Amino acid sequence: MRTFIIKANEAHTRPDFKLNDLPGTSGRIDVLCRFLNSAFLLSHGFRKNVRVWLLLYGPPEPPKAIRFEGSRLKVRLNPDERSTARLIVKALKAGGGLREPGKEVEVYPGLYVSNRTFEDVVRLTLKNSAIYYLHEEGRPITDIRFPQNVAFVLGDHKGLSPEDEAFLDGIAERVSVGRKSYLASHVVAYINIFLDSLPNPP
């Protein structure tokens, strides 16, 4: 199983944005749409061995945790950002009345929303997966021997805060796909391709 966790510092937590202007009105939910498509989509297929957590920390009701479970997902992911953003809108609407942090609502089969925090999701993932934090100064990904259950933590265009990084220290090994800062969607695509090339891929 491959899990990808991305923290979106400014992504809106209420569906108050325009689908025709995601970059300008949503706190960059367009970044999350591209991330999802890179995590799941193949040229002529869909990755069922992938789980994605979108952790939204923008206004007005942070946090919101949206989980896409590839093995159970019934709704179609298309390459365009608009249709993917509609799924996020549906999740935010379904999660609007949530009060309990641990309660998760199923929006569609394989699509869930909750009020879990970044720390909650990392701790939950740690129970079943080795966790890696994508960082420019990390150990080269080509040097890592990956187990069968892996999880990768990424920041959005703003990155993770010093507090987030301090929390990950001792929990997640820092790994790098290169010494430059790359787009999150490109990073997840590269990781999938790299893992696919291993003799016994996760």
UniProtKB/Swiss-Prot annotation:
Coiled-coil zones: none
GO MF annotation list: S-adenosylmethionine-dependent methyltransferase activity; tRNA methyltransferase activity
Chief site of localization: cytoplasm
Pfam families: Methyltrn_RNA_2
NCBIfam families for this protein: PRK02135.1
Annotated family: Belongs to the methyltransferase superfamily. TrmY family.
Descriptive protein name: tRNA (pseudouridine(54)-N(1))-methyltransferase
Lineage: Archaea, Methanobacteriati, Methanobacteriota, Thermococci, Thermococcales
